[in-house]
Design a protein with these regions (language model features):
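C-terminal solvent-exposed extensions
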Residues: 34, 38, 136, 174, ...
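Second-shell loop/turn segments in exported
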Residues: 1, 40-48, 63-68, 131, ...
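Flexible, polar/acidic helix-loop-strand segments at domain edges
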Residues: 2, 82-179
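Solvent-exposed coil/turn segments that connect beta secondary-structure elements
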Residues: 14-17, 26-31, 47, 74-77, ...
């Protein structure tokens, strides 16, 4: 693993009996015991000891029993989104502006291209109001997930991340197994996980319903 703070933490619960998938975000700036009674921002646990340390932190502080993990970088998310044909997402003027800014760095980090979205004119009085639905490619949708400077701050940021993951699950449900297998082949090398490919294959019926 890379000795850097984690950007995002999402706890995912998969119920194989009810076919239900639930997601809960942990704010990365939450003050938690990250180990040895050291209290600091939760995202530091990953830098201190990788995914295992992050899991220990969550289990210790939140009384959970997490045993498995998957970590991925921006490149993996971009790849999945592009493999599924992009996402149609309603955006506000503020989100378009911030997303375009993040796209510059996301494109450099992943080596993938994008086209900046044109901001509507004139600038609306309420910049947080939805101005339209836009088709986003991997770089754009990943940059959308990174936005944290709108009025909703980190709460809005984590909500966007869960929204994108939910939309990806929905698209995967209608993509077909051949597309899902292609995504696995493309993305698995970019992911560090405690799960084997066989484990993930066993989750597919639940994840795609």
């Amino acid at each position: 693993y890379s000795a850097q703070n984690s950007d995002t933490m999402i706890i995912v619960s998969v119920n194989n009996d009810t076919k239900e998938v639930r997601m809960v975000s942990v704010y990365r700036d939450t003050l938690l015991n990250v180990g040895d009674d050291t209290y600091t921002k939760a995202n530091a646990a990953y830098a201190l000891g990788g995914p295992e340390q992050a899991i220990t932190m969550l289990n210790t502080n939140l009384d959970l029993d997490i045993s498995d993990y998957a970590t991925a970088d921006f490149s993996a998310l971009v790849e999945v989104i592009d493999d599924l044909g992009g996402l149609d997402i309603p955006l506000s003027y503020a989100e378009i502006e911030h997303m375009n800014n993040y796209c510059v760095e996301t494109s450099k980090l992943t080596g993938k291209d994008y086209t900046p979205l044109e901001k509507p004119e004139p600038k609306p009085e309420d910049q947080e109001a939805i101005v339209g639905t836009y088709h986003l490619n991997g770089v754009q949708a990943t940059s959308y997930c990174r936005i944290r400077y709108t009025a909703s701050l980190d709460m809005g940021r984590t909500e966007r991340q869960r929204r994108v993951l939910g939309m990806l699950f929905d698209k995967a449900k209608i993509a077909g197994l051949s597309s899902i297998f292609k995504i696995m082949d493309d993305v698995f090398p970019m992911v560090t996980t405690s799960l084997s490919k066989q484990d993930i294959l066993g989750l597919i019926p639940t994840l795609i319903g």
